[in-house]
Amino acid sequence: MKFENFNILATAGYTPERVVPNSELTTMMTTSDEWIVQRTGIHQRHVVTAERTSDLCTRVAQQLLQRSGLQATDIDYIVVATMSPDYQTPAVSAQVQGNIGATKAVALDVNAACSGFVYGLQVVHRLLMGDSPKTALLIGGETLSRLVDWQDRSTAVLFGDGAGGVVLTSALAQDGAFIAADYRTMGEQGRYLTAGANGVDSPFASDPQPVLPFFKMNGRRVYNFAIKQVPASLRRVLDQGHLAVTDVDYFILHQANQRIIERIAEDLTGSMAQFPVNIGQYGNTAAASEPLLLNQLVTSHVIKRGDVLALSGFGGGLTIGTMILRY
């Protein structure tokens, strides 16, 4: 199989300073540290106090430029995956572009909820295809604490804020390569995970609707979706790439819930050895979760050049996206 050049030049991650441990949540709702850890694997989460999604993403973009040795004017594209933008418009990517002075970069946002970063990988992969080498920043960033009802323990215990990203290029900079990808949307199940309903309050509305800003989730439906669809998607990309499970060095999964990841690992390999996790530190950060984990593994020298990585995101939409690449 001929692999296409798809190189990660640098990784970066940022989380707000404010940490909310489970013990603090017990003062806000009827719950306990034991209850949260047993059901989710989460011990704490980071939350913003004044920062916005664009601020988190800008910090990541600045780190990416520093670590890659690139100038802002070297960037051709900026793609931000988020479900918690500052505004309906401008896009977070446009705000980042302006903040870092990437004057020639085309900027766009992707909203595929918790699948957003992996959807963004496919968008960037397509953007970079062409005759001349191009370079892009791909960032997943979220301030989900703004979408949480902090009295609803079914959702409040899950989510955190943060951002992570990568510099991607089609130049022959490293040994990186795109291997295979699989993307699916099950819109008929979208009602099982919603957030940020805008409402309808126009004077011309025949049926005014209230604003519903907070997460609403059918946890059982989402759990069953994940443990069924993620292994199926991973098997499809392995087949496309003519790879065995043992050919993958690490499976970088959306950090939705420790129990979900354990079930997926048991299904695919029978072991957590290839499935690193950091949900205990950060909670579910939606589109930020995979790049935050990837950055941790790269900066701690766990992931090395030439490693084969399978990234999979899943969540609202309902959506799932999986890509295998060589780092």
UniProtKB/Swiss-Prot annotation:
GO molecular function: 3-oxoacyl-[acyl-carrier-protein] synthase activity; beta-ketoacyl-acyl-carrier-protein synthase III activity
CDD domains: KAS_III (cd00830)
Top-tier EC class: transferase
Broad class of where this protein is predominantly found: cytoplasm
Keyword Lipid metabolism in record: yes
Keyword Cell membrane part of the UniProt annotation: no
Pathway note: Lipid metabolism; fatty acid biosynthesis
One annotated GO biological process: fatty acid biosynthetic process
Reaction catalysed by this enzyme: malonyl-[ACP] + acetyl-CoA + H(+) = 3-oxobutanoyl-[ACP] + CO2 + CoA
InterPro entries: ACP_syn_III_C (IPR013747), ACP_syn_III_N (IPR013751), FabH (IPR004655), Thiolase-like (IPR016039)
Pfam family name, one: ACP_syn_III_C
Region (ACP-binding): 255-259
Catalytic machinery residues: 114, 254, 284
Similarity field: Belongs to the thiolase-like superfamily. FabH family.
HAMAP family named in the record: FabH
General function of this protein: Catalyzes the condensation reaction of fatty acid synthesis by the addition to an acyl acceptor of two carbons from malonyl-ACP. Catalyzes the first condensation reaction which initiates fatty acid synthesis and may therefore play a role in governing the total rate of fatty acid production. Possesses both acetoacetyl-ACP synthase and acetyl transacylase activities. Its substrate specificity determines the biosynthesis of branched-chain and/or straight-chain of fatty acids.
UniProt comment concerning the protein's domains: The last Arg residue of the ACP-binding site is essential for the weak association between ACP/AcpP and FabH.
Record text on subunit structure and interactions: Homodimer.
Name under which the protein is recorded: Beta-ketoacyl-[acyl-carrier-protein] synthase III
